[in-house]
Each structure stands twice: as structure tokens, then as C-alpha cells.
Amino acid sequence: MFKVGDILTYAFQYSARHPHFVRVVRVTPKSIAVEKLENKVVSHDGYGQNGYVVPNLENPGKLIEGTFRVQESKYFGEYCKISGCYATLWNGTPEEFYTD
């Protein structure tokens, strides 16, 4: 089960990829509450269209209203759906973003 302080990542993706990060702020037996964190660009192509981001842990996040049910998948383990995307535990490496 996720724990308070865990960082999760999810991305909107079709012809572009826009990663997002959230931090777990409350845990119940079957759900979590999260706050949305700002992205911090760590590298880009010079135009800001392609690159890598990490969560900005220096600024406080913004609480997302409601709770999210935690589920289990044999493919990628524990997750919850946020804004229609699968949020999973962030592995600590920068996430790629790009636009077409």
C-alpha cells in the first residue's frame, strides 16, 4: 500500500506526453488523498518542447479534492486512477515530456 510522502507519477499521452506528479498526503485502507506537485524541468531541447522533468519538492503542492481508490495490477503493481490515467510509484528518475 502507498504511504504518506510517496510520490506518484502519471502522464497524459496521445501524440504528446505530459507527465504529472502527486504526493500522498493521507492513506485509508483502500484509498489515498494526494496533492499535485509542480514540475521542475531538468533538461530540454532548447525550445521547451522535449525534455525531462522531476517533481518540484521545494514548493508545497495543491490538494486534489477527493480520494482515489488504490488497485493492484499484475503488469505494473499498485496504482490509482487520477484524471483517467494510471498513477504509479515514481522511481526517482526524470520523466520524459514531448510534443508533436
Language-model regions, residue ranges each:
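Mixed-charge, low-complexity intrinsically disordered regions
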Residues: M1-F21, S31-D100
